[in-house]
Curated annotation (Swiss-Prot):
Native source species: Rickettsia prowazekii (strain Madrid E)
Taxonomic lineage from the root: Bacteria, Pseudomonadati, Pseudomonadota, Alphaproteobacteria, Rickettsiales
GO terms assigned for molecular function: rRNA (guanine-N7-)-methyltransferase activity
GO cellular component annotations of the record: cytosol
Protein known as: Ribosomal RNA small subunit methyltransferase G
Entry's family note: Belongs to the methyltransferase superfamily. RNA methyltransferase RsmG family.
UniProt cross-references to HAMAP family, sorted A to Z: 16SrRNA_methyltr_G
Length: 191
């Protein structure tokens, strides 16, 4: 994956900020620090190949340490909203958002309480599909969901299909053999 040097520099600043804050608010597992670029940065950046237009509004739910939302903003997505219920993490996200040249809004609320619209909704290490869909019922996603998922993705799809109608594509993660990117659109509740 080719990344411009200016973006790499900003991502390095972001990495250093995470390392500094991680000591006090546990943003990422200490076990992932040695493999930070592959585990967190590239894992987030790989979503860019499924974002055809960077001039959109992207919402990242359960943003935590800013993956993938902050990374996608640094990579060029023009408007990103980060939804995070933990105030301490929101304070970190506000600091981290200054690294990007693009618009980042931090929303310190529970996801299910928010009514907003966007082109794309992302999340990483958040929850299963049913929970994601339930929590985001008040969010109007015009284009698609881009969800970074682990090895239980097929079970999640089968379970979600019992309550929801949706189209999906499964993409292989470039950072993890068992990881997948679920590209979901046309979501409607059936029960």
């Amino acid at each position: 994956m080719k990344v411009q040097s200016e973006i790499i520099e900003k991502l390095e600043i972001f990495q250093n900020l995470i390392k500094k804050w991680n000591k006090s608010i546990n943003l990422i597992s200490d076990n992932t620090i040695p493999n930070f670029w592959q585990r967190h940065i590239l894992d987030s950046l790989q979503l860019m190949q499924y974002i055809s237009n960077k001039e959109i509004h992207l919402i990242d739910i359960g943003s935590g340490a800013g993956f993938p939302g902050i990374v996608l903003s640094i990579a060029g997505v023009t408007k990103v909203s980060l939804i995070e219920a933990d105030l301490r993490k929101c304070i970190f996200l506000a600091k981290a958002s200054k690294i990007s040249n693009n618009s980042i809004q931090i929303i310190n609320q529970r996801i299910e309480k928010i009514e907003i619209d966007c082109s794309i909704l992302t999340c990483r290490a958040f929850s299963n599909l049913n929970t994601i869909f339930n929590y985001t019922q008040n969010i109007s996603v015009r284009e698609k969901f881009l969800l970074l998922k682990g090895k239980s993705y097929l079970t999640e799809i089968v379970e979600a299909k019992e309550r929801w109608s949706f189209d999906y594509l499964i993409h292989q993660s470039i950072t993890c053999g068992s990881g997948k990117i679920l590209e979901i659109n046309n979501l409607t509740k059936i029960i």
